[in-house]
Design a protein with these regions (language model features):
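A short, N-terminal "cap"/entry segment at the start of jelly-roll beta-barrel domains
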Residues: 56-139
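Short acidic-glycine-tyrosine-enriched beta hairpin
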Residues: 181-239
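Extended, charged low-complexity segments
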Residues: 6, 12, 272-301
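A short hydrophobic beta-strand segment most commonly corresponding to one strand
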Residues: 251-268
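Intrinsically disordered, low-structural-confidence terminal and linker regions
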Residues: 1-29
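Conserved short histidine dyad/triad with adjacent acidic residue
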Residues: 102-104, 137-160, 183-184, 239
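Short beta-strand His + acidic residue motifs that chelate non-heme Fe in jelly-roll/DSBH
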Residues: 177-178, 237, 243-249
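Short, conserved beta-strand element in jelly-roll/cupin
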Residues: 161-177, 181, 259
Length: 301
């Protein structure tokens, strides 16, 4: 059972673009307009129960609309639990998000290898302002993804910070999160600050090519904690705070729902890497069908 029992029409309207933006651009030609869907689902009412919405998604022959509804209900549950500090039933939300991905052709799902070596699938992106910024993704770690990336580069540039407050809920597996501090006034620096520059012409929701560019600021790193998180647990990262994540669940998968929000303040995003490197291009494999990974995760739940 989810905490969210109903969705009102204004919330639905506000969520339309952030949900649609999480799909590949071709999805725009498949999904009906906001006005059409609003009329179809609400039919003059101000609210609709999540049970009614899910029942509609189960019964309609329009798979693109079904995918949208499953994703909407799942994402709204994540946001509600985050903002109200409620326990997130990750299995319930997983079922909705998994359906949302499975029911449409894989080419309509944006999926790419993130800088930390996981498969990243956007689910919701609201980016009208920094203060109201909200970005939710599904992250999947699995050793089958190793062939799509340069593992040394992933390791070299895996310590990073975020502009926004981040929270990660573990769906399955065993996720590690190490935290770091640094000092720049040191004679024993081993690392440097890097700026990540994205190829602006590429997909704005999941970039798949970027450069880590040396900023001429050297630093000494200190690991301050090592954490391990399991299914039904979560961890949080404050803006500007350094961390490094990964998974410890081989040969099985690990998966998380990961969110950024601007409501907790704005920080600075940067990457720490070996100081002997001046510039490094990071290519991320795009359009990896996630279905086999969804199947694998289902067997773990």
């Amino acid at each position: 059972m989810t905490h969210i029992q109903k969705i009102d029409i204004s919330d639905f309207c506000d969520s339309y673009n952030p949900i649609v933006k999480s799909y590949a651009t071709e999805y725009l030609s498949k999904i009906d307009s906001l006005e059409s869907i609003k009329t179809l689902l609400f039919n003059g009412l101000n609210t609709k129960s999540t049970i009614e919405l899910i029942d509609f998604a189960d019964e309609t022959t329009d798979n693109y609309l079904s995918s949208f509804i499953y994703r909407l209900v799942g994402v709204k549950e994540i946001i509600f639990c985050r903002e109200n500090k409620k326990h997130l039933n990750t299995n319930e939300v997983w079922r909705l998000i998994s359906k949302s991905i499975r029911i449409i052709p894989s080419e309509l799902t944006i999926s790419s290898i993130g800088s930390q070596g996981f498969l990243s699938i956007p689910l919701y992106k609201k980016d009208l302002s920094l203060e109201t910024f909200d970005f939710i993704r599904l992250h999947i770690w699995d050793d089958s993804l190793d062939k799509f990336m340069d593992l040394k580069k992933c390791q070299d540039f895996s310590i990073h910070s975020h502009t926004f407050f981040a929270k990660s809920w573990i769906i399955t597996g065993k996720v590690k999160n190490d935290r770091y501090e640094y000092e720049t006034e040191s004679d024993f620096t081993t690392h440097s600050f890097f700026e990540v520059q994205y190829n602006k012409s590429l997909n704005e929701v999941n970039q798949h090519s970027s450069k880590a560019v040396y900023k001429n600021i050297n630093a000494r790193l200190f690991k301050t904690s090592e954490e391990v998180h399991f299914a039904k647990g979560y961890y949080e990262i404050e803006p500007s705070k350094l961390h490094q994540s990964g998974h410890l669940n081989l040969p099985n998968s690990s998966a998380t729902f990961f969110s950024f929000t601007g409501k907790e303040g704005i920080g600075e995003s940067f990457v720490i890497g070996p100081k002997e490197i001046v510039e490094s291009e990071i290519n991320r494999k795009m359009n990896i069908s996630p279905i086999y990974l969804l199947d694998k995760i289902d067997t773990q739940l």
